[in-house]
């Protein structure tokens, strides 16, 4: 049995791509997208017509509406290939605006429903700021399910659990990147691999907290740099994996066993944790890695959204 099939015994495998032509090869249940992945996709010849057609059909509409319609078209194409859910991201520039995030999420859902997609097949991706988490809380109360992304710090995960969001995406690779950069020449790749990887340790702590305290929010590890990180998180509720790493797992027959176990998590001695807004902001501020990577991630997604808008404007001319 290859590692990808072995992983499926313990974890729901999700494809992290906007390239829906690749999906059938790996048979994921769900798929995730973000502005960077969509930008990458529309620059490929096979996807450019989809963007041009969307821009032409809705010529004269606001740029943000045309953007949402294009994201939904990608999402619908993905849903034609997979049995589960697609995650579609709200504009990262709204990450500090609760009401605007709610409004944009509701529009995305309306657009999906107009295409005949059931609300339960869509997760709205929102950055894990305090404002984003509050928006997700409100959306969940309205039956719109959310995926809280750019999650690097334990306090973000706790707040998401309190808000009863559907799913969180704690990042592994970007945490690994930060600690490796900080260590510089002192970094020992072998010693910090697998279960010792700082990104893996972060997701494990979140998973154990959720399972120990019976928090229903799904944990989906994201942002992987190598298959060792994935193997070390076998048993996590879901893992969203880029096609290149899915292919590597499918080509490997190395042993893979469960690393995260909900029953084991329930036996741990853990203290309950709760955050109000002030406590959340202080805890995040105290976490230099979490603060820096959250800000960096929002900036990067915002920049790629602007690049997408520029391509759409070119297509409209």
Swiss-Prot record:
Signal peptide bounds: none
Pathway info: Carbohydrate degradation; pentose phosphate pathway; D-glyceraldehyde 3-phosphate and beta-D-fructose 6-phosphate from D-ribose 5-phosphate and D-xylulose 5-phosphate (non-oxidative stage): step 2/3
Cellular compartments per GO CC: cytoplasm
Any one GO biological process: carbohydrate metabolic process
MF-aspect GO terms: transaldolase activity
E.C. numbers: 2.2.1.2
Residues annotated as the enzyme's active site: 125
HAMAP family: Transaldolase_1
Function in brief: Transaldolase is important for the balance of metabolites in the pentose-phosphate pathway.
Subunit and partners: Homodimer.
Protein name: Transaldolase
């Amino acid at each position: 049995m290859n590692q990808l099939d072995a992983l499926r015994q313990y974890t729901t495998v999700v494809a992290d791509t906007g390239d829906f032509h690749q999906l059938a090869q790996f048979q994921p249940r769900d798929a995730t997208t973000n502005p960077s992945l969509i930008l990458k996709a529309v620059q490929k010849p096979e996807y450019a017509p989809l963007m041009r057609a969307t821009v032409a059909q809705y010529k004269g509409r606001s740029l943000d509406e045309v953007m949402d319609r294009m994201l939904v078209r990608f999402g619908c194409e993905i849903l034609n290939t997979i049995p589960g859910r697609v995650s579609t991201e709200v504009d990262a520039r709204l990450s500090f605006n609760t009401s605007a995030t709610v409004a944009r999420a509701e529009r995305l859902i309306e657009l999906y429903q107009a295409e005949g997609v059931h609300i339960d097949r869509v997760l709205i991706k929102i950055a894990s700021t305090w404002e984003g988490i509050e928006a997700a809380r409100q959306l969940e109360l309205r039956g719109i399910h959310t995926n809280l992304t750019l999650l690097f710090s334990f306090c973000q995960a706790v707040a998401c659990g309190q808000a009863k969001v559907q799913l969180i995406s704690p990042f592994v690779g970007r945490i690994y990147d930060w600690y490796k950069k900080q260590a510089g020449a002192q970094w020992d790749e072998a010693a910090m691999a697998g279960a010792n990887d700082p990104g893996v340790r972060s997701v494990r702590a979140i998973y154990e907290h959720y399972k120990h305290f019976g928090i229903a929010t799904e944990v989906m590890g994201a942002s992987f740099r190598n298959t060792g990180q994935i193997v070390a998180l076998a048993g996590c509720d879901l893992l969203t994996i880029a096609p290149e790493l899915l292919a590597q797992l499918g080509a490997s027959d190395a042993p893979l066993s469960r690393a995260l176990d909900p029953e084991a998590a329930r036996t741990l001695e853990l203290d309950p944790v709760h955050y109000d807004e002030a406590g959340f902001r202080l805890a995040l501020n105290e976490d230099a890695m979490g603060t820096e990577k959250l800000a960096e991630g929002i900036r990067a997604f915002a920049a790629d959204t602007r690049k997408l808008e520029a391509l759409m404007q070119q297509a409209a001319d």
